[in-house]
Design a protein with these regions (language model features):
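A conserved short coil-to-beta-strand element within the FAD-binding core of flavoproteins
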Residues: 1-11
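FAD-site-proximal beta/loop scaffold in flavoenzymes
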Residues: 24-98, 185
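A structured beta-alpha segment of the ubiquitous adenosine-cofactor-binding alpha/beta core
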Residues: 2, 15-24, 36
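Short, surface-exposed charged micro-motifs
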Residues: 4, 48, 61, 160-162
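Short acidic, glycine-rich loop/turn motifs
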Residues: 16-20, 60, 165
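A conserved FAD-binding loop/helix module that cradles the flavin
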Residues: 72-130
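Flexible, glycine-rich terminal cap/loop adjacent to redox cofactors
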Residues: 97-98, 114-187
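A short alpha-helix-loop-beta-strand transition element characteristic
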Residues: 50-52, 99-108, 134-139
Length: 187
């Protein structure tokens, strides 16, 4: 998890947490590319919709302050990912048509960083578990022992699983490997 980005004389220093340890690297550039900035300068106040520069304000059921209007996707100012907008739009449709309202579960949204190798994760991170003081087991499997990786000569990487210490329930997972974004859905 990136905790700080600082411009130095010749480069940029990116500081991040790996577990509880802080590390840093010098880079030439930092790119953040996700979603779009929400357009909220449309006179939403005329419809009784509350908003801020970061997006339209909604309750847990994606309902705006105008109770007959719901919102989903980039206009909420959240993740800015297509699959999140799709999930939110399905929840909005359900909540409009049904009395039993449902809420989005953002813990189940996969996240992918397209670098070499790709890094994909889902659920809670180790930092999240530590902050919440949850007891968990951690298992890390290096790609070098996975037969398919050996055959494809892609041994650099790992799969990390975080599970509830008492129940064994999956709490989070990370894959660092070629095509990790395609594999994370299996977890």
């Amino acid at each position: 998890r990136v905790v700080r980005v600082a411009k130095e004389a010749v480069a940029t220093r990116v500081t991040f947490l790996r577990g509880r340890e802080e590390h840093s690297v010098k880079v030439e550039a930092v790119l953040l590319a996700a979603g779009k900035a929400p357009r909220v300068d449309l006179g939403l106040e005329n419809a009784g919709i509350e908003y801020s520069p970061s997006g339209i304000e909604v309750n847990n059921h994606l309902q705006t302050s105008a109770k007959h209007i719901y919102a989903a996707g980039d206009v909420l100012g959240g993740f800015g990912l297509t699959h999140v907008a799709l999930m939110e739009s399905r929840i909005v449709a359900h909540n409009i048509l049904n009395k039993n309202k449902v809420t989005p579960n953002y813990q189940s949204i996969p996240r992918i960083t397209y670098i070499e190798p790709e890094i994909a994760s889902v659920g809670m991170s180790e930092d999240d578990l530590i902050k919440r003081d949850l007891s968990y087991n951690k298992s890390i499997v290096p790609l070098g022992i996975v037969g398919r990786s050996v055959i494809a000569d892609t041994r650099d990487g790992f799969v990390k699983i975080l599970a509830d210490k008492k129940t064994g329930r999956l709490l989070g997972a990370t894959i660092a490997a070629p095509s990790a974004g395609e594999m994370i859905h299996e977890l």
